[in-house]
Amino acid sequence: MATAPLRRSLSLWQVSLSGIGVILGAGVYALIGPAAGQAGNALWLAFVLAGLTAGLTAYAYARLARLAPRNSPEFQYTALAFGARPGFVAGTLMLLADVLAAATVTIGFGGYLEHLAGTPTVVNALALTVALGAILWLGVEQSIAVAIVLTGLEALGLLLVIAVGMPSWPATDYLTAPRGLTGVSSAAAIIFFAYLGFDELGNFAEEMRRPDRDLPRALLISMVATTVIYVLVALSAVAVVDAERLGASAAPLALVVGRVLGKHADMVLSLLALAATANTVLLLLAASARSIYGMAAAGVLPARLAHVGRTAVPVDATVLVLTVQAVLVVVGTLRQVAAITDAVVLVSFMFVNASLCWLAARHRTPSRGGRRIAETLIPSLAFVLCAWLLLHAGLASLLSAAGLMVVLVLLGSLSSIPHMGYRR
């Protein structure tokens, strides 16, 4: 079955803003509380550690994007280095993580809306899934346009948190960490979820006008911008509300704003959180569908999933993602669905970092001299940091990720993946 190409229409600024949108997203709104409970006033340091891990991994994505600027980057990059079977494992792990993350945030949206309107969480989550499905069907440009508007709203909420906390910065001791390095590392493992999204930019490679030039730039822009915002949010949050109280709050950032500006500001921030959660889900669903498209086009998933509709959207892949998402939000809880996401993502990132290190060491990248050394050392450090955070992700998450790895390795061994036409 012939694979129809996607339409190349996205510019650098469109992809950069969508990257900022999916990274900023809902994770920080919900997870900054539990992270503060672990790290204390040194919460900012946990964001730096998580951001450093994500940023060094983003370097691997940026370098590898020049070699394989195609959708489903985890599959493409790992397969380029180690073959299609490991690529299948890495790509499918990230695909599962994306769908799990989208379901997690959708349930979070449902909870926020239930708090404001009183309608059941599951009904709200399903309604959001249907509404975003309609937006996705319109096409990638329309989806990105909606995402850019929502990105502005979610950034406004975080800037509000920063502003209300700035006057209290000088009086705050930012080195107080009751649990020391262990607490900071555990907090970094928790809030690593808030950095997920930069990797999704690779799933828009086949719809970018100049992916070889613009994809690495978009990765750099989105990572730097979001890390700066996150650190400033962390500084303000613990300056206004005690870290222990943040850890016990279901809506920590709303608590921060409400403490300074009153209960009406609390409601405003909750509305902005709805925009943040909706934006994250929209971009995760769009990226997940294109990841499936990329793997189907490469021959490791059924060719039908590479079918492109009249709006230049991978229709069957999108329907599959929406269906799985709907099932997850009905049968799962926020904690159940979110439990393994970080661990699965960290394992997939380890595959990507190992891929760049291996390709550079074997002189299979076009770089020379110092740049080739950097392509070996930087992903090696990122690999170690990913492993460090993985060890602090919790036993249940580790066991779940290990179980998925075993299942995918068995599926890859029993299938005919090497003969499915993977294109290097």
Model-predicted regions and their roles:
Residues 18-26, 151-164, 222-230, 352, ...:
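Small-residue-rich segments of transmembrane alpha-helices in multi-pass membrane proteins
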Residues 1-31, 38-42, 55, 59, ...:
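Membrane-interface "cap" regions at the ends of multi-pass membrane proteins
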Residues 47-49, 116-140, 158-161, 315-324, ...:
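Transmembrane alpha-helical segments of multi-pass small-molecule transport proteins
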